[in-house]
Amino acid sequence: MLRRGFIKQPPFVKIFKIVSPESTNAKATHCEVEFPLKVQELWRDKHHVIFNKPPLALSQLPDKRTWYNTHDYDPPVLLDIVQSSSGSILKDGTYEPSYYPIHRIDTPVSGGIVYAVNKQSAQQFSRNLRYGGNKGFSLTRKYVAKVGKSKTANECKEGLIKWNGAITYFQRVDNEHLILQLVTGKKHQIRKLTQQVLDSPIYNDLKYGGKKVFDSDFQIALHSAYIRTKIGFNIHEQIIPVPDGFRMIWGESVDQNGNFNEDITRVLKEDWAGTIKECLKKLKIQETKLADNQLIFVS
């Protein structure tokens, strides 16, 4: 049995003021977030499940000694929320684990997140994330970012970037939207890259220079919008809508059901595997000529 420190508390509402209404195309003056947070299950099989994570949900348990210094509510840990929904948390706060985390999503980011449903499947996903190729169960993730306009947008529309120890493939849909695929992962990888390399900070990402939309950075305009898993010969693709209650920041980028517009959806569905493979070959050649950790761009 595991103890996560899950605490059940009565429902409540947090209110966040809109400070840039032109960025949301909304008539509202604030955004209301209801707690406990709701997490939608999108798909599952005998190996894994895909949930739609809302902003504010934590991918891991925080240090409670510091959490309550800045928060007046209990930490909404994603794993606790989905375990609670499955009815597996007992009165004493313990449970037999039903889900095993494969990867993480930053707290203010929304979208698809994969959990394995048994220890063996978790090991297979971890094996692929570590070694790549055909080893284990493969996981492909694409994110949509709504960004500020960049002076270099027309010069740098798509390609593979190795920077700060991580590799990312990206494509600009238009002046305000980027789609990015993680080839190798690192903390805050996309958020740093959009600001420091692409000159396109994400809306409301105050930590990395984004345009302020709300009076808090509880949510940024970054969404895990596409997940592809390959287990043996079985391939599953999932397009993930923006969760209900968190669509305001996206304005006209999404419809009333949280689905992205046709241009964004089209790019999300594109298979970049061949292109990324060719770019990685070019990257390997360039790496032999350049110093470690130097920015490398190939297309």
From Swiss-Prot:
- Give the GO molecular function terms: 21S rRNA pseudouridine(2819) synthase activity; RNA binding
Q: Which GO terms describe its cellular component?
A: mitochondrion
Against InterPro entries, the record matches this protein to: PsdUridine_synth_cat_dom_sf, PsdUridine_synth_RsuA/RluA, RluA_PseudoU_synthase
CDD domains with a match to the protein in the record: PseudoU_synth_RluA_like
- Where primarily located? mitochondrion
Q: Which GO terms describe its biological process?
A: enzyme-directed rRNA pseudouridine synthesis
Query: What is its biological role?
Result: Pseudouridylate synthase responsible for the pseudouridine-2819 formation in mitochondrial 21S rRNA. May modulate the efficiency or the fidelity of the mitochondrial translation machinery.
Question: What's the encoding gene here?
Answer: PUS5
Family recorded in the similarity comment: Belongs to the pseudouridine synthase RluA family.
**Which EC number(s) are documented for this chain?**
5.4.99.43
Listed name of the protein: 21S rRNA pseudouridine(2819) synthase
- Keyword terms: Isomerase, Mitochondrion, rRNA processing
Q: Which reaction(s) does the protein catalyse, per the Swiss-Prot or TrEMBL entry?
A: uridine(2819) in 21S rRNA = pseudouridine(2819) in 21S rRNA
Superkingdom of source: Eukaryota
Active site feature: D106
Q: Where in the cell is it found?
A: Mitochondrion
